A protein has these predicted regions:
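Solvent-exposed, polar/charged alpha-helical surfaces in well-ordered, non-transmembrane soluble domains
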Residues: 39, 45, 66, 70, ...
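Secondary-structure end/capping motifs
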Residues: 220-302
Length: 322
């Protein structure tokens, strides 16, 4: 969102304000019951004098990226890195500016079936339904990876059906039999009656899998604001590593209370880390190679078609340069 100056009709993107910043308001998307690195950065004072402007809920990575590219928000929601690779491959003018999350040995997340389900392997999923929040993102990639590693051929993989579920309904869909497998976390797992089939960490290990994307147009018009926000996010991620887990969760709970949205904070107590392996959320080519290789394997990309430096930039993450 642009800085509003009464009596001035000039677009804020062309203005220089406090500390050389082009805008003091920054539009973003959030998720109910969750605190993102961007929101923590603001609460810790790392974005000041910039204020976040909440634009609503993100339904998933691709929608979050599209929101940033269209200008509905100034940055994407934390989005699957594979979606960012597809974005660049299709020629869309956007750039990954900082990591948002990664895979790690998380006991509170995975892809689950009912405890008494006959599904015990990838092959058992043939003819079954799998719940997802959105098509073409992380759940779909990890499912296909699991099925391939389980020995399924493309024809068999196509017999596994993805079902798009409304936000927050995965557990209900699984327990009611609407789907046979669903991504679950925290409270849903603790309630029991479910069994983990696989998880992201089992498939890719420690890897940065989530990112923040910004439109190239916004970056060009707001370089100082971009630098302030991206560096602030990096600082917040490092802060979360350096503090005891219970203190980080307590901070999250305070943030939820202050923002006064209709949301349930039950997931917060299951937070352990954001799982970003690199210091200061810095990216390297290797973070994207797995997704590029997958697109090449599926025939969506040719060898050497992608210049990794067009996917991401650490230029605005000053904290990663320390």
């Amino acid at each position: 969102m642009s800085l509003v100056l009464l009596g001035c009709s000039k677009p804020a993107s062309k203005l220089t304000t406090v500390d050389g910043l082009e805008s003091l308001e920054f539009k973003y998307l959030g998720s109910p019951g969750i605190v993102t690195p961007l929101e923590l950065a603001e609460d810790l004072g790392y974005l000041a004098p910039i204020k976040l402007s909440y634009q609503g809920v993100s339904t998933g990575g691709p929608q979050g990226i599209q929101s940033a590219l269209s200008g509905d928000s100034d940055i994407s929601s934390p989005s699957f890195a594979g979606s960012a690779v597809k974005m660049v491959a299709s020629g869309v003018p956007g750039t990954v500016v900082i990591a948002a999350y990664g895979t790690f040995d998380d006991p509170f997340a995975g892809y689950y079936v009912l405890e008494n389900s006959p599904i015990h392997s990838a092959r058992d999923l043939i003819g079954k339904k799998v719940g997802t929040n959105i098509l073409g993102a992380q759940v779909e990639y990890m499912l296909k990876s699991y099925l391939k590693k389980g020995g399924l051929n493309p024809e068999e993989i196509n017999q596994v059906t993805l079902v798009v579920l409304p936000p927050g309904s995965a557990e209900q869909a699984l327990r009611s039999g609407h789907v046979d497998l669903a991504p679950l976390a925290g409270p849903a797992i603790e309630r029991g009656g479910v069994r983990r089939l696989y998880r992201d960490y089992d498939l890719v290990g420690d890897l940065t899998t989530g990112s923040y994307v910004m439109a190239n147009r916004y970056i060009a018009e707001h370089p100082n604001t971009t630098r302030k926000v991206v560096t602030g996010v990096a600082k917040a991620i490092e802060w979360s590593r350096q503090q005891p887990r219970d203190q980080v969760i307590a901070r999250f709970e305070q943030i939820l209370q202050k923002r006064k949205r209709p949301e349930n904070g039950a997931m917060l107590k299951y937070w352990t880390q954001w799982g970003i392996p690199s210091k200061a959320a810095k990216f390297e080519d290797g973070d994207f190679k797995i997704w590029v290789d997958n697109l090449i394997e599926e025939g969506q990309l040719k060898n050497n078609q992608i210049d990794y430096k067009k996917i991401y930039s650490n230029q605005y993450n000053e904290y990663s340069q320390h």
